[in-house]
Amino acid sequence: IESIDIITPTESFSLDKSGEKSARNAPGWRISQVRIDDEVQTQPTIPFDIDRIATLLALLSPLYVDDIAYDLTDEEKNDIVFAGKVHFKTTDGEHTLEIGTPADLSKHPEWTFYGEGTRYVRFDNSPTIAIMAPQRIVGIFPSLIDMRSKEVWQLDSTSFSSIEIAQGNQCLRYRPVAPNV
């Protein structure tokens, strides 16, 4: 994917691989059309706000690849609750991305209700956890994405056939290589 265009009733903006977007995001916008590499995608069956749809699209895109990866200690692993799971199919098979939050937020002042700070991710059950740079995520997705019920987003794409968002409440994105590669 080279670019993503998001069109709303009032304005549109694009994301590219540099992380730049052409118009400022605003919570509450409703999506009206999505294009990936100039191809119009299947419309969602229920309305999504612009933050949520941007997050789902980012999960499918090799954007923002400046993640830092490291192996957690046993103590650190016990301190993390994996509250979200993304299951999706690509042309190279099925993958799973798990989204974690600290079990005790009082130990982690970098976390707030709105999701600012460190994210913990496990890709395909890998013991390696990726730390997401907070300014990169908060800058792109300023509000918390709350996905309390399962939702399915279908894309007419040669690279991705489907994505399923399960229980979870963190805004994250997928990159098409494991964090420890």
Predicted regions and their residues:
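A short-motif feature that recognizes glycine-rich, charge-decorated loops
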Residues: 1-181
